[in-house]
């Protein structure tokens, strides 16, 4: 029984990681212009240099968050009401809960195997 649970958790982690990779590629395909470059890695370097780090504001560029150790950070927004009852939206790059759990399981799995 415990092997089935362990296999299920590892399977869900890998499935979540694959989904994140596919989603990142789709977002890049939709958002970026098709650019022909001599260096095939120039776009990847450009994205890495211009990405928004974890816990930084991404209100103006919601798809510009950097990659973490396994997954790309997601831009999460909240609405803030100030003392004058004016509502503003603020966004920051964070690690979603499912991704945190998946990274924890992978780290735990690495400790068990090592």
Curated annotation (Swiss-Prot):
Predominant cellular place of this UniProt entry's protein: secreted
What GO molecular functions are on record for this protein? toxin activity
**Where is this protein found?**
Secreted
Query: Which organs or tissues contain this protein?
Result: Expressed by the venom gland.
Q: Which UniProt keywords apply?
A: Disulfide bond, Secreted, Signal, Toxin
- All disulfide bonds of the chain are 51-66, 65-93, 77-91
Q: Which residues form the signal peptide?
A: 1-20
Prosegment residue ranges: 21-45
Under Pfam families, the record lists:
Toxin_35
The similarity annotation says:
Belongs to the neurotoxin 19 (CSTX) family. 04 (U1-Lctx) subfamily.
What is this protein's name?
Answer: U5-lycotoxin-Ls1a
Q: Which organism is it from?
A: Lycosa singoriensis
Phylogenetic classification of the source organism: Eukaryota, Metazoa, Ecdysozoa, Arthropoda, Chelicerata
């Amino acid at each position: 029984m415990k092997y089935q649970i362990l296999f299920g958790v590892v399977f869900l982690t890998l499935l979540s990681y694959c989904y994140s990779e596919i989603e990142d590629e789709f977002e890049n395909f939709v958002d970026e212009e098709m650019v022909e470059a001599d260096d095939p890695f120039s776009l990847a370097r450009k994205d890495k240099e211009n990405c928004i780090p974890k816990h930084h504001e991404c209100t103006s560029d919601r798809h510009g968050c950097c990659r973490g150790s396994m997954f790309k950070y997601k831009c999460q927004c909240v609405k803030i009401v100030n003392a004058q009852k004016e509502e503003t939206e603020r966004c920051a790059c964070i690690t979603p809960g499912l991704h945190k759990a998946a990274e924890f399981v992978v780290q735990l799995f690495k400790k068990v195997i090592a």
